[in-house]
Structures are given as C-alpha cells and as structure tokens.
Amino acid sequence: MTIAHYHLPGLFEFYELYCRFLPLYRNHPEYFYDWCDIGSIYGAPADCLWGGGRVGSGEASARDVLALMRDYGISPRLTFSNSLLRAEHLRDARCNALCRMLNDGGNGGVILHSDLLLRYLQKTYPNLYFVSSTTKVLTSFPDLQAELERAEFRYVVPDFRLNHALEKLNALPQGQKDKVEFLCNECCYFGCRDRRACYEAVSRKNLGEDGDEHRCHAPDAAGGYRFSKAMENPGFIGVADIQRTYLPMGFENFKIEGRELGSALVLEFLLYYLTKPECQLKVREEIYLDNMLDLF
C-alpha cells in the first residue's frame, strides 16, 4: 500500500502538543488512518538568524525536542529558509549548534532557500538532507522541474499554486514525483503577487535588519488564517484529494503549514489529515477536552 508522508509544523513551537499527541498516535493506531504516517516535523527556535518563512517562536530545549523525535522515529527538520544570508552569517553559533545536533542524530534535515547556506551545510554537516523551501515561490512549472533535477535536494516544495497542475505533474518521472512535497493547507490569496516580498521581509526581520514592514493587500487579509478559508483556496489539497488523486499518481509527500498559528488550530490539522472522523472526538478528549472545561 502506498503511504502518504505528512510533514508537520512546529518542531519547537508545538513541542508540548506533540508530547501529548505522539503517545496517542503510537498507542492507539485504531484512531488514525492506516494510509499515512508522520514523515517529519519542522520548525525553528525563536531568534534564529538563519530562520525564514515565519519568525520562529519556539522556546523548547533542542535536546528535549530531538529526544522526542528520536523516541518516535520521526525526522526533525530545521526551517532555515532565510533568503538574504551573507557569508558572515554562516558563523552564527546557535544555528551551527543546532545543525551539529541534527547531523549527529543521523536523520535530520534542513529546509532552506539560500544556495550559500546549502553549500556550507553540505561541506560542514554531511549527514543532513536538504529540502528546497516553498519560499522560493516556484510558480513556473519549468522552474519546478529544474529544481527537482538538483541532486542536492531530497525534497522540493513547489508554490501551492502548482498543486493542481495535475497533467504536468503526472508527466514527471517517478524519481521526481518522489521529491515533490505539496503544501496542502495554504491560506494565502491565490492571486498574490507579493509572496516573495513577504518572505524577504521575514528574512530581514530574522537578521535584525531595518526594512519596511510587509503589508498584505490580499482580500480579507485582516481576517488572518482560518482553516475553513484555506479549504476554499483553489490550491487546497484535502484528504480525499490525497487518497483519490495524488497517491494513485505516485506522490507521497505532503506538507502542512502552521508554525505561526495556535496549537488548537494545529491540532485541528492533525485531526483532519491523520485522524478517522469517528475518532476525532476521542483524540480531543485525550489532548485537552474534559467535562469541566469552560470556554466562556
């Protein structure tokens, strides 16, 4: 049976959630779909110079985080997708220490944008694998193909607007299909032309550099992320899409975004993508829901 591998958000940011969820996932397999598993969990601690995509907010200890991943056989990934790195940034002690820990663990990866960082990590930490970040905004199919041809990347995350270019995607050779990692639940406006500028603003912020704050001009931007809105996005990939379309076509890797969101919403992602509908209430009860919980 072909298995869908999910790549989940919040390695550091949602450590406490995963401390509750992963034992449940292991001890009650009957609650969860048997056609999918957890391929990796990605994220970055707060104040990481090499960080990108989102400003990291995780405060959990790296040793605790990596011990949890090791206990459950899950690949940890560092989100180091800053697109504005310069040579002097490669000496950053904290980011190097994190990479060293992953390198020693043997199954860790780094999500990145910068070729400068890629070359440095290849030379310095040979046990790491690399993921080409969606922050590259690969909206052109020839650009995606060129990225898939790069041997240094184990996975490539295309822009979500290529998710349903099914005829072109299906024509890829299987070796390239194995590398595609679809971003499933993006809520960003499908017609956005500022996505690259948005990511660059985050990169500047992580470097501590001055710059104009990016202002999102998308319709309904003030409403923030809503999963219900993401489900209406033309680029959305849902459970039925994965089972009926992507797995039969030979695609197995699916990324769930959400590092900057609250843990309650991330739990909803875990329920939707991993959990059988009839068991979702049981998972909520195990994680947080009891008969004395008040909302108001």
Each language-model region and where it sits:
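Active-site pocket-lining/capping segments in soluble small-molecule metabolic enzymes
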Residues: 1-143, 147, 153-296
